[in-house]
Amino acid sequence: MASSSSAAALWTAAPHPHGSCIRIHAIFHQRHQRRGRRPVVVASSVRPLQAASLAVATAPVAVASRRTAAEEAVYEVVLRQAALVEEATHRRGAGAPRWAEEDAVDWGLLLGDAYHRCGEVCAEYAKTFYLGTQLMTPERRKAVWAIYVWCRRTDELVDGPNSSYITPKALDRWEKRLEDLFEGRPYDMYDAALSDTVSKFPVDIQPFKDMIEGMRLDLWKSRYRSFDELYLYCYYVAGTVGLMTVPVMGIAPDSKASTESVYNAALALGIANQLTNILRDVGEDSRRGRIYLPLDELAEAGLTEEDIFRGKVTDKWRKFMKGQILRARLFFDEAEKGVAHLDSASRWPVLASLWLYRQILDAIEANDYNNFTKRAYVNKAKKLLSLPVAYARAAVAS
């Protein structure tokens, strides 16, 4: 679903580590032995789609009646991440680990280079967000870069120039590599940056695994029968990003909101962004044989798959799109409520990203709902106008 701009440079790692990468392996191994790593938390061996049904079956009736199967499965991940953050808050102040001085020097140089490379990738492919990260503390800024690069590399597996060669086994290997870096065994420089990040912040592995699950879906699934199915897909490929990054961005010390509610807002932003991607890219996706719209809602609107492939804007299509855009805006509204509860230095990049993405919906409307042959975008002038307003709003958020 994401754009497949060339990111081949992210895939230049040699089949076998060499040079500085060998030293990275050695230092990580030594740190792992000396420190003891936080164990990787895995919810269960049940696949997320199976877990969805299981969660509803075992949940109290009151909860099950409020949430769909997909929402319940995602809610479990939100609770897990919130618990990790609260646990880390209680542990804070225990003291930093110590290791040999010569290792610390080597490690600092190598890791500095790894984070620098992540920053370069973020600056090239996410310019506005990169600008916003400059307001964060150096440690948070670098951690967000590392997470961004991992997400981009994962997306490139199924949406990049080599996507036709990707198999389920390749994604299994990528997931094993993820587990290794969470255990302190990075494969390359980019992995090293993320491995260091997850050792410093209370980041759960499950959202990362779930994003890979979304890539698996893209290998075989090109239709979504209902919004419940689509919601789960949106969580996998975009909602997960919010759960990955909030532990890094931090929650404001004076926030009265529950940790869970802040994570729900982050999840809503990811869902809103992906729904916006879907509505913007209807024509592009249809030319690839894909329809990321709820088929049952299409049918209720008197539309068919053939109408999508035909690509003609009709009154039925306009009415249908108005409903889809409204839903995306509701998710953006829910997400915006959580921005005020983020750490003050993290609010601006999040709010700016939210406002700019939400304006894509305005652009679809301005194009008379023609998302078949016209690509909705926010022009540079509007972006420049939005950024200072978002900054001012973030500064006074409380």
UniProtKB/Swiss-Prot annotation:
<dbReference type="InterPro" id="IPR033904">
    <property type="entry name" value="Trans_IPPS_HH"/>
</dbReference>
<dbReference type="InterPro" id="IPR008949">
    <property type="entry name" value="Isoprenoid_synthase_dom_sf"/>
</dbReference>
<keyword id="KW-0809">Transit peptide</keyword>
<dbReference type="GO" id="GO:0010287">
    <property type="term" value="C:plastoglobule"/>
</dbReference>
<keyword id="KW-0472">Membrane</keyword>
<keyword id="KW-0934">Plastid</keyword>
<keyword id="KW-0808">Transferase</keyword>
<dbReference type="GO" id="GO:0046905">
    <property type="term" value="F:15-cis-phytoene synthase activity"/>
</dbReference>
<dbReference type="InterPro" id="IPR044843">
    <property type="entry name" value="Trans_IPPS_bact-type"/>
</dbReference>
<dbReference type="GO" id="GO:0051996">
    <property type="term" value="F:squalene synthase [NAD(P)H] activity"/>
</dbReference>
<protein>
    <recommendedName>
        <fullName>Phytoene synthase 2, chloroplastic</fullName>
        <ecNumber>2.5.1.32</ecNumber>
    </recommendedName>
</protein>
<dbReference type="Pfam" id="PF00494">
    <property type="entry name" value="SQS_PSY"/>
</dbReference>
<dbReference type="InterPro" id="IPR019845">
    <property type="entry name" value="Squalene/phytoene_synthase_CS"/>
</dbReference>
<comment type="function">
    <text>Catalyzes the conversion of geranylgeranyl diphosphate to phytoene. Mediates the first committed step in carotenoid biosynthesis.</text>
</comment>
<dbReference type="GO" id="GO:0031969">
    <property type="term" value="C:chloroplast membrane"/>
</dbReference>
<keyword id="KW-0150">Chloroplast</keyword>
<keyword id="KW-0414">Isoprene biosynthesis</keyword>
<keyword id="KW-0125">Carotenoid biosynthesis</keyword>
<dbReference type="InterPro" id="IPR002060">
    <property type="entry name" value="Squ/phyt_synthse"/>
</dbReference>
<comment type="similarity">
    <text>Belongs to the phytoene/squalene synthase family.</text>
</comment>
<feature type="transit peptide" description="Chloroplast">
    <location>
        <begin position="1"/>
        <end position="80"/>
    </location>
</feature>
<dbReference type="GO" id="GO:0016117">
    <property type="term" value="P:carotenoid biosynthetic process"/>
</dbReference>
<dbReference type="GO" id="GO:0004311">
    <property type="term" value="F:geranylgeranyl diphosphate synthase activity"/>
</dbReference>
